[in-house]
A protein has these predicted regions:
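N-terminal leader/targeting segments
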Residues: 1-42
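A short, structural micro-pattern
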Residues: 8, 44-46, 83-85
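A broad, low-specificity signal marking well-ordered, structured residues that form hydrophobic/aromatic
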Residues: 11-12, 50, 89
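Structural motif
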Residues: 14-17, 55, 91-94
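Short, surface-exposed beta-strand/loop "edge" segments at domain boundaries and coil↔beta transitions
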Residues: 20-22, 59-63, 96-101
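Mature extracytoplasmic domains of secretory-pathway proteins
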Residues: 30-71
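Short, compact, well-ordered microdomains
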Residues: 67-106
Length: 106
């Protein structure tokens, strides 16, 4: 059977070390919560990190993350992933570090 998929996106899976310790406390607040319709509907928590679907937001995503207190360093790392051709980034504590990308040991 041939599936007809009309929408897809490309995700990079990278270490949670590519966000600061402060970001690791702020990202859960930015994550969408469908029970109370709070947070950004393109940022999602996982058991081991977060998925940020910045490519689904046009140009407003940086400002929206800043509004939640996400650091410029983390935003720059997400932009680097976007510039490499990815639509979203999954920060996972078990994923590898990306050579040349700023990271923090927290």
């Amino acid at each position: 059977m041939m599936l007809k998929i009309t929408e897809s996106y490309k995700t990079a899976v990278i270490s949670t070390a590519h966000v600061t310790a402060a970001d690791s406390e702020r990202l859960p607040i930015a994550c969408f919560d469908p029970l109370d319709d709070r947070g950004l509907n393109w940022v999602h928590g996982t058991q081991y990190g977060w998925i940020v679907r910045a490519g689904m937001r046009g140009n407003d995503w940086k400002e929206e993350l800043r509004d939640y207190g996400i650091s410029q360093e983390a935003i720059s790392n997400i932009q680097a992933i976007r510039d490499a051709g990815y639509d979203s980034v999954q920060f996972d504590c078990d994923a590898e570090l990306v050579d040349g990308m700023p990271a923090w040991d927290w």
